[in-house]
C-alpha cells in the first residue's frame, strides 16, 4: 500500500510552483520598495513563546498547536504564526539597539496548525507577513495597510475590502472588558463552553465566537468605541485620515476582533467580495501589538504587522479567474542523432548552461521526431540539431521554433551565437 500524504497538507507540483514563485516575488519586490528586510526564523520554538506571545486563552494555543517534547525533555512547538517568532528574534538578537529604527521586517514561510482541513484552511500553510517594530506613529499603521492593499492589487485581485477597528489602549480595553462581563454574565450559560471559559479570561474573544455569533446578546454587546480613551480616539482618527489621504478605501467595523491576545489600537482585515470563493472571505489579518515585545522579555517596544495566507491568495485569484498563465520556456533544446553526436551534445548543453542559457537535451534515446516533440512541450525557443553529418563538418543547425527559420552555425561559435540570440531577442 502506497504511503499517503498527511491530512491537511499538499504537494505543490512544478506546474503550480510557478504561481507560488510569482506571488512570492511580488512580495519580495514590494517589501524592497517599502524598505522591509527579510528575516528567517526557526520552524519550531519553545512552547512558552506561544503561550506568552499568542495567549494561552486563544484557540491556537488551546486546540491547534503541534507540540512535542524533544529527547532532552524540552517542550517545543511548530510555529503556528509568525509574529511571536519574529518578535522573539528581535529581542534575542537585540535588533532594538540598531541605528536604523524602526525595524521593518518581512517573512515568507510555512506555519502549522491542527485544524479541520477545509477550503482555505490547511494544517501546513504558507504565510507572508510584515512586522514594523519600534514606532508608535499612526503613519506606520497606514504604511502597513497600504503595503498589504498594494500587494493584492499588484496580484490583480478586485473587489477588495479593508475593514479596520480600534481595540484601544490598556485603559480603554479594561473598561470595555468590564462592560462585556456585565453584559454577558447573566446569560453566559446560553453560550458555548469556549465562551463560558472566555468570560473571565478574555471576554473580548466572545465577540469572535463562530458558534454563538447569532445570539441576540452579540448584537447588543457594548462597543469598544464607547470606551476608547481620548488618546485612543485621536490615534484611530489619525490612522483614518492617513488612509483617506492615500485614497485607500476602508470600512470601520466596531465588532472586528482579531483571534490573538496581543492586539491593541489598530486591528484590521482584508476581505474579498464576489461569487466563487465559497465561505472564506478573509484574506489577511493584522494589527498593532504594543506590549508584545515586553511580554516575551524585551524592552518596551510598539509594533504593528499583518500575516496573509498564500493559499487563500491563490484561491482568490482562481475564483476571479485572474491567475496568471505560466509557460516556462527554455532557451534551446539540443537534438542529437548518433552516438558521437550524443556525446558532443552533453558538452554543448553544459557549455550553454554555463553561459547563462537554459538548455535541455534528450536522455531517453528518442529519435529526432520524439526529441522535437519534447522541445515543443518545453516551449523551447530554439532547437540546436547535431547529427553525424553536422559533426563531421563542425557545424550545428539552429532553428527558431517560432518562425521556422534555420541557420548553420559553427560548433565553436554556438555559445556566442546563442547568447546573442537570447540576450538580443533576435530571430535566427
UniProtKB/Swiss-Prot annotation:
- KW Nucleotide-binding (keyword) present: yes
Tell me which EC number(s) this protein carries: 6.1.1.21
Task: Tell me what this protein is called.
Answer: Histidine--tRNA ligase
Q: What Gene Ontology terms for biological process does this UniProt record contain?
A: histidyl-tRNA aminoacylation
Could you tell me the gene encoding this protein? hisS
Q: How does it assemble?
A: Homodimer.
Q: Where found?
A: Cytoplasm
Q: Which GO terms describe its cellular component?
A: cytoplasm
Record-linked NCBIfam families: hisS (TIGR00442)
Species, as recorded: Halalkalibacterium halodurans (strain ATCC BAA-125 / DSM 18197 / FERM 7344 / JCM 9153 / C-125)
Keywords carried by this UniProt record:
Aminoacyl-tRNA synthetase, ATP-binding, Cytoplasm, Ligase, Nucleotide-binding, Protein biosynthesis
Q: State the Gene Ontology terms under molecular function.
A: ATP binding; catalytic activity, acting on a protein; histidine-tRNA ligase activity; transferase activity
State the family named in the UniProt similarity comment for this chain: Belongs to the class-II aminoacyl-tRNA synthetase family.
Under catalytic activity, the entry for this protein gives: tRNA(His) + L-histidine + ATP = L-histidyl-tRNA(His) + AMP + diphosphate + H(+)
Amino acid at each position: 500500500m502506497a504511503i499517503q500524504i498527511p491530512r491537511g497538507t499538499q504537494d505543490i507540483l512544478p506546474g503550480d510552483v510557478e504561481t507560488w514563485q510569482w506571488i512570492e516575488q511580488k512580495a519580495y519586490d514590494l517589501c524592497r520598495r517599502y524598505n522591509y528586510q527579510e528575516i528567517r526564523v526557526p520552524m519550531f520554538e519553545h512552547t512558552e513563546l506561544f503561550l506568552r506571545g499568542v495567549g494561552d486563552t486563544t484557540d491556537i494555543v488551546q486546540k491547534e498547536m503541534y507540540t512535542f517534547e524533544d529527547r532532552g525533555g524540552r517542550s517545543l512547538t511548530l510555529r503556528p504564526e509568525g509574529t511571536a517568532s519574529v518578535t522573539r528574534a528581535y529581542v534575542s538578537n537585540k535588533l532594538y539597539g540598531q541605528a536604523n529604527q524602526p525595524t521593518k521586517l518581512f517573512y515568507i514561510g510555512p506555519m502549522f496548525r491542527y485544524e479541520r482541513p477545509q477550503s482555505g484552511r490547511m494544517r501546513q500553510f504558507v504565510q507572508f507577513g510584515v512586522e514594523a517594530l519600534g514606532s508608535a506613529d499612526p503613519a506606520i499603521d497606514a504604511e502597513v495597510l497600504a503595503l498589504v492593499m498594494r500587494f493584492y492589487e499588484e496580484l490583480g485581485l478586485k473587489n477588495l475590502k479593508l475593514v479596520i477597528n480600534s481595540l484601544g489602549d490598556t485603559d480603554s480595553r479594561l473598561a470595555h472588558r468590564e462592560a462585556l462581563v456585565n453584559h454577558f454574565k447573566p446569560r453566559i450559560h446560553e453560550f458555548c463552553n469556549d465562551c463560558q471559559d472566555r468570560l473571565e479570561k478574555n471576554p473580548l474573544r466572545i465577540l469572535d465566537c463562530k458558534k454563538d455569533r447569532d445570539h441576540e446578546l452579540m448584537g447588543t454587546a457594548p462597543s469598544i468605541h464607547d470606551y476608547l480613551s481620548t488618546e485612543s480616539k485621536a490615534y484611530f482618527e489619525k490612522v483614518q485620515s492617513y488612509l483617506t489621504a492615500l485614497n485607500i478605501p476602508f470600512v470601520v467595523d466596531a465588532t472586528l476582533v482579531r483571534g490573538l491576545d496581543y492586539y491593541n489600537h489598530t486591528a484590521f482585515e482584508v476581505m474579498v467580495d464576489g461569487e466563487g470563493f465559497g465561505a472564506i472571505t478573509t484574506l489577511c489579518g493584522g494589527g498593532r501589538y504594543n506590549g508584545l515585545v515586553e511580554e516575551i522579555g524585551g524592552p518596551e517596544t510598539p509594533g504593528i504587522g499583518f500575516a496573509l495566507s498564500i493559499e487563500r491568495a491563490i484561491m482568490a485569484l482562481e475564483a476571479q479567474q485572474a491567475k496568471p498563465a505560466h509557460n516556462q520556456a527554455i532557451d534551446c533544446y539540443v537534438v542529437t542523432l548518433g552516438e558521437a553526436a550524443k556525446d558532443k551534445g552533453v558538452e554543448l548543453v553544459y557549455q550553454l548552461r554555463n553561459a547563462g542559457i537554459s538548455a535541455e537535451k534528450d536522455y531517453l534515446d528518442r529519435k529526432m521526431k520524439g526529441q522535437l516533440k519534447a522541445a515543443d512541450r518545453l516551449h523551447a525557443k530554439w532547437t540546436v540539431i547535431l547529427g553525424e553529418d553536422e559533426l563531421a563538418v563542425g557545424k550545428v543547425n539552429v532553428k527558431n521554433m517560432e518562425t521556422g527559420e534555420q541557420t548553420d552555425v559553427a560548433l565553436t561559435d554556438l555559445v556566442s551565437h546563442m547568447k546573442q540570440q537570447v540576450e538580443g531577442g533576435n530571430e535566427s
